[in-house]
Amino acid sequence: MVSSTTPSSGEYLLEMSGINKSFPGVKALDNVNLKVRPHSIHALMGENGAGKSTLLKCLFGIYKKDSGTILFQGKEIDFHSAKEALENGISMVHQELNLVLQRSVMDNMWLGRYPTKGMFVDQDKMYRETKAIFDELDIDIDPRARVGTLSVSQMQMIEIAKAFSYNAKIVIMDEPTSSLTEKEVNHLFTIIRKLKERGCGIVYISHKMEEIFQLCDEVTVLRDGQWIATEPLAGLTMDKIIAMMVGRSLNQRFPDKENKPGEVILEVRNLTSLRQPSIRDVSFDLHKGEILGIAGLVGAKRTDIVETLFGIREKSAGTITLHGKKINNHNANEAINHGFALVTEERRSTGIYAYLDIGFNSLISNIRNYKNKVGLLDNSRMKSDTQWVIDSMRVKTPGHRTQIGSLSGGNQQKVIIGRWLLTQPEILMLDEPTRGIDVGAKFEIYQLIAELAKKGKGIIIISSEMPELLGITDRILVMSNGLVSGIVDTKTTTQNEILRLASLHL
């Protein structure tokens, strides 16, 4: 299926037309188009697995396209590497930043193309040119600072400045705001608009609809490897884009709430982490069947709460009471034995073993329970439980031997949640559970969470997405600079109240 709306003729910086790419048994791209104008910000949207990454890999020469044409500034191109693309004016700022943490900012800016004076690197010239670019983009970073000492948002600014230094005409940004505060997002948007004013074409990839409508001029939607539409944002609604992405209308963004919170199962009093700055005097209750959200700005120490409960961080004071009995989780194993489970924020770095199969990733948190009387692993039980994870979590995969890194983000997250459910937890803690997941898969994750709450699990969710917290939780605990600034009832609170509480102790 394709839309009747096609990009109108006109001057384009980048024209990708009729791009096809197949892998054994799979047609990854089927006659896909992407056309980007100068002085524009162009959203590239689609569910995970829609073909966005494959299309861009064809542009950068990582994959060789089967057919189709790519024109850049009116000339046909066929790059063989990302380096060649960059040298010719096409740059990409990746979600996983590609910087050398041990080197200085200006080293990273000019790596592989240092200005020289005789036989030596011209440090003064490198500093001056880096500073000039930073000044033009309103970036307040010391060019001599070591990259490893900077925040994620500052690192992203460096990546954008690097693209600027190559005089890039096309800049592709992949989920650039996933780890940024609202203030940092606004600064990033200012820089993106500066690039637009200078004549750049920006390709902006994000699952955050609010950002797309705030920033972009046009949108191209892909689905199942096909081009669906390219349209101006001004004539679209959020529901229309979602319908194009998923192939159907999503009548609601969040499932109906059918859980009924019961008695208190977890009492946390004056919890303080040993290594400061961290959480201080955190107190709250969690009820059976309740979904408790944790809100706060970046740096509020939200993650420190669940890490301290799970034994990753050592507590210096406070009590944790489970079913009326005081417990101490000195490490993750003790936490698991007490019925806690933690789905971590950084899925790819701490949640999955990307190059191993679904079976391994499903069972690793519970692996010792599969040993038989002679100490060998019970393969039939392992296979059965892996299949349970696939079926009950509705994981889309050819089979349990599939490498988990090849799955979409949503399906990876389902496997991780299923893995923890095999440990039979009473308390499931999820840190940014839908980060980097497309809108259709988000709804499926919300459904799973709602079903678990309905079955009586106590659930704690940390999220930076306010609509998510307001859409699925029963109560929201708001953190500010390591302190609890309030606990609000989701039904009666507002986004403004939560933001006010989040700023209380800054």
From Swiss-Prot:
Membrane-protein topology: Peripheral membrane protein
EC number of the protein: 7.5.2.11
Positions with a binding annotation for ATP: 46-53
Catalyses which reaction(s): D-galactose(out) + ATP + H2O = D-galactose(in) + ADP + phosphate + H(+); methyl beta-D-galactoside(out) + ATP + H2O = methyl beta-D-galactoside(in) + ADP + phosphate + H(+)
PROSITE patterns: ABC_TRANSPORTER_1 (PS00211), ABC_TRANSPORTER_2 (PS50893), MGLA (PS51260)
Gene Ontology CC: plasma membrane
Localization in the cell: Cell inner membrane
GO MF term set: ATP binding; ATP hydrolysis activity
Broadest EC class assigned to this enzyme: translocase
Domain ABC transporter: 14-249, 264-506
Subunit and partners: The complex is composed of one ATP-binding protein (MglA), two transmembrane proteins (MglC) and a solute-binding protein (MglB).
Function comment: Part of the ABC transporter complex MglABC involved in galactose/methyl galactoside import. Responsible for energy coupling to the transport system.
Sequence similarity: Belongs to the ABC transporter superfamily. Galactose/methyl galactoside importer (TC 3.A.1.2.3) family.
Protein name, entry field: Galactose/methyl galactoside import ATP-binding protein MglA
Organism of derivation: Escherichia coli O157:H7
